Amino acid sequence: MKKGNVIIKNASQVITCSGFEGKFGKDMNNINVIENASVVVEDGIIKEIGSLEDILKKYNEKHFEIVDASNKAVLPGFVDSHTHFVFGGFRAEEFSWRLNGESYMDIMNKGGGIVNSVRGTREATEDELYESAKKRLDSMIHFGVTTVEGKSGYGLDYETELKQLRVMDRLQKDHSIDICKTFMGAHATPEEYRGRNEEYINFIIEDVLPKVAEEKLAEFCDVFCEEGVFSVEESRKILLKAKELGMKIKLHADEIVQLGGAELAAELGATSADHLLHASDEGIKAMADKKVIATLLPTTAFCLKEPFARARMMIDKGGAVALGTDFNPGSGFTNSIPLMFALATIYMDMSIEEAISAMTINGAAAIGRAETIGSIDKGKKGDLVILEYPSYKFLPYNTGVNIVETVIKDGNIVYKKSY
């Protein structure tokens, strides 16, 4: 049999999430469930979805790996569209501080938070970062993640920012998971520039961004647009430079306070704005009107004991919601897709179908890849997840438990649960 060739036969459900762009508003509930279906992946590309009888008239079983999905549901590979998975050091002590009532900004202002991770990441060698990040990707694939977005932003200097991006470059070549790289030098102001934000912004714009764009080290530029971090005007300046250099843009917006990050994302035509815990009604509407994906990160709100983002309002206003884990060493040290799914459906008033769209086709749209991943459509990459159970509704029902049995990436089995 040829590599990249697989037939998944007799699935109780194939949830296609069909489409080549993000799903907005009511369309998020349309996940297109096909009962008793099979899927053909040839040379890593999805070729057919239909009955096994019809498929075997066109394709010779001898040339394919056969996976029996009887009494199991098949979905598109999950897309985790917001993570910070390349970092050095840990921040377990800060979790205790938060439990004792200290806020995210309290911890950041006393030298914890992002700048704490910056110290650990600067000290780590490229090989050390590579090995630790590889283990994290191994864990993610067990949850059904076949594509992940990863950010720099724990360097905040020229050498370490590029080091983080080059680690992701190496992992893209060596690991099954596809990686969308985001430059986030504007994650915080480093200690050596404290009180000199303008100088640091000029350093990013004049020295780092041009190098990242020239070497194509990242597809996206992201900025932490937040009170006490980067203002709306500072964020606009950085993001406009990134656009000028040919990069796509996204924002950490309105996470801690209502600053106007959602409105800025709409103004600049960002691909996504993320977090949005305190986004204004006007910002939510502007994002929906301008087709900016709202990437929501429920595990972070949960860990920070903050109110959840208003997913229901965003969808009802005609917006598109994606879900990401925000896996990072501080505010959300978890890559658990089951936990994220449970929080989205139980606490954010998302339907099961909306949450599935948010983890698949809208996650793909949030990183500009909805034409090639995020749904089970002919011509897309053969990235598929097989659940242990016959229905997608078991995802929240078996609350917080990983029910992924098999993961297929580019038509190859890359994970199979051992019982």
Curated annotation (Swiss-Prot):
Q: Where does Fe(3+) bind?
A: 82, 84, 252, 326
Q: Which CDD domains match?
A: Imidazolone-5PH
Q: In which pathway does this enzyme or protein participate?
A: Amino-acid degradation; L-histidine degradation into L-glutamate; N-formimidoyl-L-glutamate from L-histidine: step 3/3
Kindly give the InterPro entries that the UniProt entry links to this protein: Amidohydro-rel (IPR006680), HutI (IPR005920), Metal-dep_hydrolase_composite (IPR011059), Metal_Hydrolase (IPR032466)
Q: How is the cofactor bound?
A: Binds 1 zinc or iron ion per subunit.
Residues recorded as binding Zn(2+), renumbered to this chain, are 82, 84, 252, 326
Protein name in UniProt: Imidazolonepropionase
